[in-house]
Amino acid sequence: MLVNSYELMVILRPDLNEERVSQEVTKYQEFLTNNAAEEVSVKVWGKRRLAYQIRRFNDGIYVLFNFNGEGQQIALIERDMRLNDNVMRFLSIKLTPEKPEKEKKAKAVAVEA
């Protein structure tokens, strides 16, 4: 059982009220928890300007999820987000673990030699 760290960025429609945004965030947070994700943390960044229009909107509500899990949660939550009209875009990333300083220094010395 290999546990990895993941980051999931979601952009919600800007015309959702605070209550609806809270419902969507809670829905996906519970979804992750119920599907064996650990240490789920959520940061709502709020309404931000988009780089380009998505569905004729210039703004979007950004939500960032960080969690640890085996990976089976990703396919399930992405499927649900594709079917949800309130989600305009999403991106999930597997985070690489930080290497200890000793390994970094040893690698740097090996490259120099």
Swiss-Prot record:
Cellular component (GO) terms are: cytoplasm; ribonucleoprotein complex; ribosome
Keyword terms of this UniProt record = Ribonucleoprotein, Ribosomal protein, RNA-binding, rRNA-binding
Q: Which InterPro entries match?
A: Ribosomal_bS6, Ribosomal_bS6_CS, Ribosomal_bS6_sf, Ribosomal_S6_plastid/chlpt, Transl_elong_EF1B/ribsomal_bS6
CDD domains, per database record: bS6_chloro_cyano
State the Gene Ontology terms under molecular function: small ribosomal subunit rRNA binding; structural constituent of ribosome
Q: Which GO terms describe its biological process?
A: translation
Q: Report the Pfam families cross-referenced here.
A: Ribosomal_S6 (PF01250)
The record's annotation in HAMAP family points to: Ribosomal_bS6
Q: What family is reported?
A: Belongs to the bacterial ribosomal protein bS6 family.
Function according to Swiss-Prot or TrEMBL: Binds together with bS18 to 16S ribosomal RNA.
**Protein's UniProt name:** Small ribosomal subunit protein bS6
Organism field: Synechocystis sp. (strain ATCC 27184 / PCC 6803 / Kazusa)
Gene encoding it? rpsF
